[in-house]
């Protein structure tokens, strides 16, 4: 990490650096855009470009100071067409008062005043200059400053402040937005001082797959063993993760023990058999006894 050019009060703590490394914010792509070269620390043998985390923190603080300088938070527009950043921009907007555009950016939002979604922000912040290129392009038409999370291969045209970071991982995106929101609240005075911990955990900014959440709820509501042995087997003795040692009274009462005769079985069979076999014998004997029958 390079020596910081910030005032001592803005220096990153060891915990901040550890979080940036744990979220893999320092891992860029294999391609390098020429304007992102100053933020490069080194290139690994496998071709991955490693970003200087010290530069990342400096740009987070710079971006937060720009955001805090705008009097009306509603004049700030945060944008993310990338799914991994949509939850993060919505949470950032909720905590700082900005306006969020999560999902597809409708062309003409900044330039076509006839549309209902027309906006005139004083600043926009985008998650990825490549996927949010339409928003950056329209901002350049109407002279709106742009702050962007830029990877090593991100285009930097019309980007005024580039925060060098990994903008493809969900943890990296969520952490950068969380740190940006925390720094803005510190500068606004919402958080008393820099030693005060923010009660919002970073996990709130991470992307969550809706289908995975639904599957998890379904798994939690399942009765143990229902899939493996069927619903009827649960009633007959499957409890928890093992079968009951003794059978239930209702189950044993209805089944006779092997090797034991049921009372009345032989008598019932012999009576019915004799009664049903007698007509059959007469029927077979009649044709032979009658000499008039010709085969």
From Swiss-Prot:
- Similarity annotation: Belongs to the universal ribosomal protein uS2 family.
How does the annotation summarize its subunit structure?
Component of the small ribosomal subunit. Mature ribosomes consist of a small (40S) and a large (60S) subunit. The 40S subunit contains about 33 different proteins and 1 molecule of RNA (18S). The 60S subunit contains about 49 different proteins and 3 molecules of RNA (25S, 5.8S and 5S). Interacts with RPS21.
Identify the stretch(es) annotated as Disordered.
273-295
Going by the UniProt record, its keywords in alphabetical order are: Cytoplasm, Ribonucleoprotein, Ribosomal protein
Offer one Pfam family short name for this entry: Ribosomal_S2
Q: Low complexity: which segments have biased composition?
A: 274-295
HAMAP family, per database record: Ribosomal_S2_euk
Q: What is this protein called?
A: Small ribosomal subunit protein uS2
**What's any GO biological process attached to this entry?**
ribosomal small subunit assembly
Q: Which organism is it from?
A: Paracoccidioides lutzii (strain ATCC MYA-826 / Pb01)
